[in-house]
């Protein structure tokens, strides 16, 4: 008895590798519906394989440290919010567990919102330790954004419940005695930094969404404090509020 296209599709969708797909008895079924199902499954498997390969690439720096010190406790650190006109700069320090596997981890700006939220929940529930650090708009104005970012990162490290032995940091160096590696575009090169990037992004977006409830005119729930047209028009219309960065243009010139 010939299987229906629906039945064959169910069999195809249960296949876990491209090799298995190509050797499947249904592979030679010439019905268009079956061939379409095979093409869709191949595309999905190729995408999954690419994510696996990227994940392995992004463990390079962690593995380098673990080769020298198998007992190393590696902390990834990243920040979000250096560019906005309002709100804090937020850092996250994250220590992944030893059997981590979060396919799709990447620079938080490249990860779709739904996937970002999914990864954030998994990370919060499963990592060995994580902590956030915040530097306020007032501190950004007092020290400058670079120094404020360092302050936020160190606060995140200080908040960890587990003491790390090594730091992997996105494009920054810290005044910290622990061994550290600063990586340009680290959130796309290290799983530890990428995890911190995701968590910091979700935390700050939530913070700005809450802030928008008190200051709806600025549209913080949509722009996260960046200088969008709506945001700039609101500043022209009603002025600034306490979480605007007075050292940032165009606000600085308005004061």
From Swiss-Prot:
Q: Which GO terms describe its cellular component?
A: cytoplasm; ribonuclease H2 complex
Amino-acid biosynthesis as a keyword? no
Report which superkingdom the organism of origin falls in: Bacteria
Provide the residue positions that the database annotates as binding a divalent metal cation. 78-79, 170
Domain called RNase H type-2: residue spans? 72-255
According to its UniProt record, which reaction does this protein catalyse?
Answer: Endonucleolytic cleavage to 5'-phosphomonoester
Q: Which Gene3D superfamilies match?
A: Ribonuclease H-like superfamily/Ribonuclease H (3.30.420.10)
Instruction: Name the gene.
Output: rnhB
Stated EC number for the protein is 3.1.26.4
This chain belongs to the protein called: Ribonuclease HII
Q: How is the cofactor bound?
A: Manganese or magnesium. Binds 1 divalent metal ion per monomer in the absence of substrate. May bind a second metal ion after substrate binding.
The residues the entry assigns to the signal sequence are none
An example GO BP is: DNA replication, removal of RNA primer
Q: Record's family?
A: Belongs to the RNase HII family.
Q: Which InterPro entries match?
A: RNase_HII, RNase_HII/HIII, RNase_HII/HIII_dom, RNaseH-like_sf, RNaseH_sf
**For this protein, what is any one GO molecular function term?**
RNA binding
User: Which NCBIfam families does the UniProt entry name for this protein?
Assistant: PRK00015.1-1, PRK00015.1-3
Chief localization: cytoplasm
Q: Which UniProt keywords apply?
A: Cytoplasm, Endonuclease, Hydrolase, Manganese, Metal-binding, Nuclease
Q: Which cofactor does it need?
A: Mn(2+); Mg(2+)
Kindly list the places in or outside the cell where this protein is found, as annotated in its UniProt entry. Answer: Cytoplasm
What's its top-level EC category?
hydrolase
- State its role: Endonuclease that specifically degrades the RNA of RNA-DNA hybrids.
Q: Which organism is it from?
A: Staphylococcus aureus (strain MRSA252)
């Amino acid at each position: 008895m010939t299987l229906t296209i629906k039945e064959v599709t169910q069999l195809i969708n249960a296949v876990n590798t491209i090799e298995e797909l190509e050797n499947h008895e249904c592979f030679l079924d010439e019905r268009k519906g079956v061939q379409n199902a095979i093409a869709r499954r191949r595309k999905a498997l190729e995408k999954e394989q690419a994510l696996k390969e990227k994940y392995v690439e992004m463990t390079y720096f962690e593995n380098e440290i673990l080769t020298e010190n198998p007992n190393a406790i590696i902390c990834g650190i990243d920040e979000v919010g250096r560019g906005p006109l309002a709100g804090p700069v937020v850092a996250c320090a994250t220590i992944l567990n030893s059997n981590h596997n979060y396919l799709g981890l990447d620079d938080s700006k490249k990860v779709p919102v739904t996937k970002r939220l999914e990864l954030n929940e998994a990370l919060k529930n499963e990592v060995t330790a994580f902590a956030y650090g915040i530097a306020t708009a007032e501190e950004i104005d007092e020290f400058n954004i670079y120094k404020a970012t360092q302050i936020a990162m160190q606060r995140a490290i200080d908040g960890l419940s587990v003491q790390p032995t090594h730091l992997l940091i996105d494009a920054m160096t810290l005044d910290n005695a622990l061994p550290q590696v600063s990586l340009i575009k680290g959130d796309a090169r290290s799983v530890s930094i990428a995890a911190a990037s995701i968590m910091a992004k979700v935390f700050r977006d939530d913070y700005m969404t809450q802030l928008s409830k008190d200051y709806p005119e600025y549209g913080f729930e949509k722009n996260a404090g960046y200088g969008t047209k709506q945001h700039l028009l609101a500043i022209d219309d009603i002025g600034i509020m306490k979480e605007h960065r007075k050292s940032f243009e165009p606000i600085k010139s308005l004061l």
